[in-house]
């Protein structure tokens, strides 16, 4: 933990950076550091973080993931309410935004809170690249995140209930691709989705390069074998592979995993009620996101809660404005220290 703290202090050489060390674990007595910038963090945020961490007493804190579960308010939500990172520059940028960073002994992962959905689709490289390149990459991530859990359900809804909205050549192509397949389309999609999830989990457990190989080559081999055996149609294999590719474009593994879970709920609702069920599932997910909060801040900021952001946080959302326009810190920082760029903000 001292090394991790030193990595942050090397990048943020300010006397206003404070590190509060506490002990966690009734028997393990693990060291936990709470870092924040004194004049940027809002009053009460550090105390709220400590209160959440002290809400339960356990024997041992083996990793920062244990602290993360105790610090989350809505444990039943599939979406992560805290941001994690292994990069010191990401932690420093979060501190300069008025957020709190929590480090745990024997863990390379830092916990950042509060956080919003927008933070899970941003990367540190977005601020190191030019505006056009960063905005294009970020736009692709947003589209990929949406498609990663909606494509299979939309396919089932359209092909089972609403084929009239498709062009006739496309309908015939779908029909010819399914000739000889003994299973309904729902079973086909579930079989391939579960196979890809199994390959992904197996790739994590296997060592090194072998794990990456089994995830890619294994998917191709199983998909081709399933098509040759007339178990699934080629359209379903392409659809599932493209959906998996979209999930890989999401920077945060925890955030991508939430979409992987919700994907099956959307599939079942779409197969049951068609396009109506597809829309119901999207509305339920949207309502849940709208109600979710992280340390009191709306999870969907800056898309909701514009009265809190003043319209400035929207400049660093789907499109990243030039750095000279990002003169204001996010809403997490104190109002009197909101300005982070000296110069003409209208330049």
Predicted regions: what they are:
Residues 1-185, 294-322, 331-347:
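Cytosolic regulatory modules rich in charged/polar residues
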């Amino acid at each position: 933990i001292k090394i991790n703290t030193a990595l942050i202090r090397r990048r943020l050489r300010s006397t206003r950076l404070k590190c509060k060390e506490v002990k966690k674990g009734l028997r393990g007595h693990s060291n936990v550091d709470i870092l924040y910038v004194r004049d940027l963090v809002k009053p009460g945020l550090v105390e709220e973080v400590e209160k959440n961490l002290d809400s339960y007493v356990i024997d041992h804190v083996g990793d920062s993931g244990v602290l993360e579960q105790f610090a989350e308010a809505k444990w039943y939500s599939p979406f992560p309410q805290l941001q994690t990172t292994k990069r010191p520059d990401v932690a420093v940028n979060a501190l300069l935004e008025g957020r709190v960073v929590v480090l745990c002994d024997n863990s390379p992962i830092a916990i950042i809170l509060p956080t919003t959905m927008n933070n899970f689709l941003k990367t540190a490289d977005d601020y190191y690249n030019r505006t056009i390149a960063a905005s294009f990459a970020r736009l692709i991530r947003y589209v990929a995140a949406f498609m990663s859990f909606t494509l299979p359900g939309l396919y089932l809804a359209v092909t089972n209930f609403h084929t009239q909205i498709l062009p006739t050549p496309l309908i015939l192509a779908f029909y010819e691709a399914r000739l000889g397949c003994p299973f309904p389309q729902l079973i086909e999609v579930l079989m391939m989705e579960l196979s890809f999830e199994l390959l992904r989990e197996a790739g994590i457990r296997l060592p090194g390069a072998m794990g990456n190989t089994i995830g890619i080559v294994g998917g191709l081999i199983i998909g081709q074998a399933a098509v040759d055996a007339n178990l699934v149609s080629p359209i379903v294999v392409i659809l599932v592979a493209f959906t998996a590719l979209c999930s890989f474009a999401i920077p945060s593994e925890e955030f991508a995993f939430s979409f992987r879970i919700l994907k099956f709920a959307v599939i079942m609702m779409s197969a049951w009620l068609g396009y109506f069920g597809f829309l119901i599932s999207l509305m339920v997910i949207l309502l849940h996101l709208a109600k979710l909060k992280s340390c009191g801040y709306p999870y969907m900021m800056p898309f909701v809660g514009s009265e809190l952001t003043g319209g400035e946080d929207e400049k660093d959302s789907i499109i990243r404005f030039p750095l000279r326009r990002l003169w204001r810190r996010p809403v997490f920082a104190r109002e009197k220290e909101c300005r982070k760029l000296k110069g003409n903000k209208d330049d």
